[in-house]
Amino acid sequence: MGKEKTHINIVVIGHVDSGKSTTTGHLIYKCGGIDKRTIEKFEKEAQEMGKGSFKYAWVLDKLKAERERGITIDIALWKFETSKYYVTIIDAPGHRDFIKNMITGTSQADCAVLIVAAGTGEFEAGISKNGQTREHALLAFTLGVKQLIVGVNKMDSTEPPYSEPRFEEIKKEVSSYIKKIGYNPAAVAFVPISGWHGDNMLEPSTKMPWFKGWQVERKEGKADGKSLIEALDAILPPARPTDKPLRLPLQDVYKIGGIGTVPVGRVETGVLKPGTIVVFAPANITTEVKSVEMHHEALQEAVPGDNVGFNVKNVSVKELRRGYVAGDSKNNPPKGAADFTAQVIVLNHPGQISNGYTPVLDCHTAHIACKFAEIKEKVDRRTGKSTEVNPKSIKSGDAAIVNLVPSKPLCVESFQEFPPLGRFAVRDMRQTVAVGVIKAVNFKEAGGGKVTKAAEKATKGKK
């Protein structure tokens, strides 16, 4: 057995009718975790419903419906393999909570795949001022997804079909607007594809002999290829932050008979081992980790990306809750935030936002009301340069530096140091009205929290 392939996460973005589902469905279908039986079942159903022409997207719709009904479907279905990577699609838009998921998402995307439709009029609709394409690309960039691939889809429906001038026109247009957002077009692969017919998806298409391939240039070196799957192979692998201090936001806390209290969550940075003396912020409870397990197997060490349960001594289920963050008491432990400063981008708020506005913030697994105490300045979204100091209010489309005060204890970090704990969604009226990236945190001084006997004992024993 060779070494296991590296895992990477991608997010697929683009306008509603760009063919994201068909393209994604095609990759999952051809290279993915869906077994033949399931595919045949889906095909038969699609045929019976007269949706034969829709099979790839249909596969995805079936998966989406199950995902939305909260059925924990076999996540393997959202995975596919390239020659180099195991790729997981962490979310595809169209899902109601896409924006929120992308921010609080259980994982950071390593790369965004932007699908644009090449059909006459379709591309223009997706990219128009109110099209979703811009918003998704802006979000991806703001949230730290620095790699981008562009699939120019539906090449079979250009005038004439598979038109080179149309591809070049779209490439030029998209390059100019992703550049405005902050991406470097020279580092972006542009691939003309048909997600439906499969052109340039896995191998070079005979229908576009004019396409000599895509090239990218970046400081890590050059890459080139012909197909979309090769572009995915050229993604730079992420550095998983094992060397940083431990941060593990809790998703749930269970009481398990005969074992005790078991918090569950995903290691975002650092490592967690049995014997670690952890502190839970913002409650400031310190205790010893007895054991760590993943998928019912004991682990000697959990690393970033691992979803684990760990057993803690002398702490009751009532003392811990979702949204708390575990860290190592001896290595830059997490603390509660008194207040914090963030760059906020307003996406869709019907009115004006001014000082005193108190929506709910979703940051990692925490869900807490925070007050916009002071809108310090309006800034240019791309450069971050100040355009107005102490504005009266901000509205949709604006970016601003804001000071926020949580209404209850909350543990957050700067995006610079701990990205997953430094980005948030602002929720109001059942939608995401803004997104933010935390610049600086004013921590509360940790005062007299609970230190369990287990922690004291373990600490004494180690002296």
Swiss-Prot record:
List every stretch annotated G1.
Answer: 14-21
Q: Which PROSITE patterns match?
A: G_TR_1, G_TR_2
Q: Where is this region: G3?
A: 91-94
Where does the chain bind GTP?
A: 14-21, 91-95, 153-156
- Give a short account of what the protein does: This protein promotes the GTP-dependent binding of aminoacyl-tRNA to the A-site of ribosomes during protein biosynthesis.
Q: Does the keyword Protein biosynthesis apply?
A: yes
- Where is it mainly found? cytoplasm
5-glutamyl glycerylphosphorylethanolamine modification sites are 301, 374
| Single GO MF descriptor | GTPase activity
Residue span of region G2: 70-74
InterPro entries registered for this protein in UniProt: EFTu-like_2, G_TR_CS, GTP-eEF1A_C, P-loop_NTPase, T_Tr_GTP-bd_dom, TRAFAC_GTPase_members, Transl_B-barrel_sf, Transl_elong_EF1A/Init_IF2_C
Q: Name one GO cellular component term.
A: cytoplasm
Alphabetically ordered keywords of this record: Cytoplasm, Elongation factor, GTP-binding, Nucleotide-binding, Phosphoprotein, Protein biosynthesis
Q: Which family does it belong to?
A: Belongs to the TRAFAC class translation factor GTPase superfamily. Classic translation factor GTPase family. EF-Tu/EF-1A subfamily.
Residue ranges for the region (G4) are: 153-156
tr-type G domain location: 5-242
Q: Where is this region: G5?
A: 194-196
- What name does UniProt use for this protein? Elongation factor 1-alpha
- Name its cellular compartments: Cytoplasm
